[in-house]
Amino acid sequence: MKVPVKWLKDYVDFDINAKELGDRLTLSGSKVEEIITSGDEITNVVTGKILKIDPHPDAEKLVICSVDVGKNEPIQIVTGAQNMKENDIVPVALHGSTLPGGVKIKKGKLRGVVSNGMMCAKEELGIADEEHVHGLMILDENTPIGKDIKEVLGLDNPVIDFEITSNRPDCLSVIGIARETAATINTKYRNVKIDFSETKGRNIKEELEVEVKDKLCRRYMARVIKNVKIEDSPAWMQERLMLAGVRPINNIVDITNFVMLEVGQPMHAFDKKMITSNKIVIERAKDGEKFTTLDSEERSLDSNVLMIKDGDKNCAIAGIMGGLDSEVAENTHEIIFESANFDGTNIRVSSQKLALRTEASGRYEKDLDPNLAEIALNRACTLIQELNAGEIVEGVIDIYPVKSEPNIVEVDYNWINNFLGIKISKEEMKEYLDRLELTTEIKGDKLEVFSPTFRCDINIKEDVAEEVARIYGYNKVPSTTVKSQSIRTGKSKIQQIKDVVTDILISSGLNESINYSFVSPKIFDKILVPEDSELRNVVKIRNPLGEDFSVMRTTTLHSMMESLARNYSHNNELAKLFEIGKVYIPSENEGEIPKERNVITIGMYGNVDYFDLKGVVENLVEILGVNKISYARESENPTFHPGKTAVIKIKNTVLGTLGEVHPDVCENYEVEERCYVAEIDLDLLLENVSLSRKYKALPKFPTVTRDISVLVDEDILVQEIENVIKRQGGTILESLNLFDVYKGKQVPQGKKSVSYALTYRDENKTLTDKDVEKIQNKVIKTLEHVLGAELR
């Protein structure tokens, strides 16, 4: 909420500067975001009147202007602007002046003709030109000559930008901030000026009817203004609107915006001749209805959206935006001023559904005080007469079925002292509360606090205590040590394992990825999950952020593919990622919370293959002390490439899956690289982890290494080959490493060549070649016999 200090001073007197005021208001609970003084960089720029315009003798696009700047003689300025004429009043930067951005203006020559300054456009003064008018800034014809431009345009008027919390809609107004200012610095607050008279002869109740058909409209007020003159607002009003961040349009629209900023109550003006039925109806829209708003956008409505209607015809979305057909135009002669109060929750939901958030909806959704409607309407009528913009027809329509009444909170003043840790008298508390217009009566040790209707946030005794603390001063509340019992705790086993897993995977060259646990139900189609798969049985979120976040994930494969796809779209040639997250499995018993499983997901693409992924997994389980894992063919997982996927097992229990992602899945994520992914059940892994380490003496005897390369049928798993080698190698086979799998021209069709490096060591003696050859031959013969292998 931007509040010009000059506007604030209409309602409260103070002689401190904007910085000090901002600091004091922040300490009392009205947080100041920033203080803006737009004219700080502007010096020696004044208003000037163009007396004469002559052509430049040597340049067709330049003209020579004689400009009166309030001195003894006019000055000569050469310009290329085309939008001015004689007698126009413009900003003039004199010799030696400075402009925003550090621009300095000096005397000079343009094509041989002396120019003693520069006439300025809006942009050159640092003013946003929302109408995109090319050329000089033309000022009001009544602007005095030779005046400092900062004073004329209000650029020397500081603006304080407040961060208003949702529980204080009363502070979304100048008078709300004025109340806070008066209470904070302990001075008087002046109410907004209400002073107008009605014109006799016609009565609104004889020519306009209002029917409220829905409780979502809590109050509806209307007045008719006749003999309306549509013109520009006076400079003082335009200045205040612009400083508050609102673009001036015309006097009628500006009055509604001015009142909204000043009082905090949104208003709307209808062109009366467009309300052809002479009856305004407030009711909900019908599903599927179309309506074109003031911004020329056609919007689709539903039965939750509250509408303002001209009989049966829609003319405004209640509390959000008016319609294009009933807006005030240059030929408008009579208007209907609307000042109403609508249900805040409904306005917020409708605004979100329509993707249409306005200054009005932003206020209504915070539940405004219905009594503001009358103040705003009367203030608008006062401004109509002040600006001589029309005449107020006699009578007012006011439908207010359930009146809002002040709330009463009773609290013991001793409780407030104990709650805040201070010690002040009940009389002092009463003074603070009265300054905030929270009328207070002392009854013994009790304070009876009457909360006005504009303070909807005062409901319980803690609210009253907060108000006392704000004005007393948070900085005066003595600091105390919080009494607590220190409890020594450590990380749980799962937390410890997660930390270890993270360290292992990072040391393996992977980067951690973090993803949402809520996803779209459409992800199962992207990863080719069958319709009857248990993975599609998901936990649904009751109040989701949107369809893309409406269910809890049962697999992390989509999340990893999303992360890989994001890296690929940013032209990363190589990505190696991991995530430690959860999946959520619905309970079989209705009403029970879902089962959560911890999952490790590893994904990579680029200059990598299946064996890189497998190596990361094997390194992980080896460091975690998980023994005897095995691999088996996975033929029923459509997310993965058939024939290039395996399940990881501990004994006979499936620990996870790893393999190459199916090309169709990669295509669904627009990744034109082969992707490799592993999904491992961390909870099951945890049951088999052994982080304890035993000392083992360094070996005394050397190793002997032999390579072996065999041809086997294509469908034989590498795991089967390794199982045979390990059994026959016995205790002296220290390790075996797969270093090649080949299918090609030199290998018969239907076969593959598999090559291993076998490392032997005997802990009790040095192995001879004869010892090794004996075991090596035993391995080869068993491979030939069991798997039909051929030695290459």
Curated annotation (Swiss-Prot):
Coiled-coil ranges from the UniProt annotation: none
Cellular compartments annotated: Cytoplasm
Keyword Plastid tagged: no
GO CC annotation, single: phenylalanine-tRNA ligase complex
Alphabetized Gene3D superfamilies for the sequence: 3.30.56.10, Bira Bifunctional Protein, Domain 2, Ferrodoxin-fold anticodon-binding domain, Nucleic acid-binding proteins, Phenylalanyl-trna Synthetase, Chain B, domain 3
Cofactor: Mg(2+)
Enzyme Commission number: 6.1.1.20
Annotated residues for binding of Mg(2+): D457, D463, E466, E467
FDX-ACB domain: residues covered: 699-792
InterPro entries (alphabetical): aa-tRNA-synth_II/BPL/LPL, B3/B4_tRNA-bd, DNA-bd_dom_put_sf, Fdx_antiC-bd, Fdx_antiC-bd_sf, NA-bd_OB-fold, Phe-tRNA-ligase_IIc_bsu, Phe-tRNA-ligase_IIc_bsu_bact
Annotated catalysed reactions: tRNA(Phe) + L-phenylalanine + ATP = L-phenylalanyl-tRNA(Phe) + AMP + diphosphate + H(+)
Family per record: Belongs to the phenylalanyl-tRNA synthetase beta subunit family. Type 1 subfamily.
The protein's name in its UniProt record: Phenylalanine--tRNA ligase beta subunit
